């Protein structure tokens, strides 16, 4: 059987079958059978099948990969990249929102402010973090942290992974739209360097609120859009089953968004996606983040602010 801890997507069935065959042969080998060459041969076939499959993913398949439950989350990047991380809680207006985590720590020896959505990896943690869908308190907390970082001249890193801001009645009553707008404006107005990385889903204003950065990076199989394919399908065709068609037409992939100038760079994922090797994904992402901050290191506050605002104005003019 394939690794019971690994969750295979529907389109990965051919790879799952090869992995299952390898596991069966390994069980035979453990009982004394000399089948090492056969195991190696099938292993090579599985690796090539995985490589070929992921080299030609459709936008809808990338959407599934971006949502994979074993994909590295915000907490994984914090553990792998940030030392001495100290999370801060509360928006000082209403309460705490654990869908959006933020705090201060050190990235490769230098002080940094980190904010981002945490989806959770278990049923309990997903409920705790509201599946990464932040309420107004989360975005107001992000504003509070960004203001602190700006005051103390500390760069800001945003790790984006959310289907969108939480659309509940309470969230709307407490000013969800205003909180998102305020967070977006704060990102644009920072006098310190800020880098955003789309690590999974970048959904609507909930993502943009912390992603209007000097450099926007995106993992190879992540997605970034104003609405989910399912919701777009329901609106356009009154039929959510056309999500695959919607995903194609919406241009939500990193490759499309780089071509449009919405993002600045695509970060390669390990063969088979980030969920197959989270540690390698985190390490590669860390290198790209360091390079992005290094590019911004010598820019003064006014230049950072002006270049960032101009960057997003240009995107609007180009795509408007």
From Swiss-Prot:
Its EC number is 2.1.3.15. It is found in: Cytoplasm. InterPro entries: Acetyl_CoA_COase_a_su (IPR001095), ClpP/crotonase-like_dom_sf (IPR029045), COA_CT_C (IPR011763). GO terms for cellular component: acetyl-CoA carboxylase complex. Its main location: cytoplasm. Residues 42-295 form the CoA carboxyltransferase C-terminal domain. One of its GO terms (biological process) is malonyl-CoA biosynthetic process. One of its GO terms (molecular function) is carboxyl- or carbamoyltransferase activity. Acetyl-CoA carboxylase is a heterohexamer composed of biotin carboxyl carrier protein (AccB), biotin carboxylase (AccC) and two subunits each of ACCase subunit alpha (AccA) and ACCase subunit beta (AccD). Component of the acetyl coenzyme A carboxylase (ACC) complex. First, biotin carboxylase catalyzes the carboxylation of biotin on its carrier protein (BCCP) and then the CO(2) group is transferred by the carboxyltransferase to acetyl-CoA to form malonyl-CoA. This is Acetyl-coenzyme A carboxylase carboxyl transferase subunit alpha. The gene is accA.
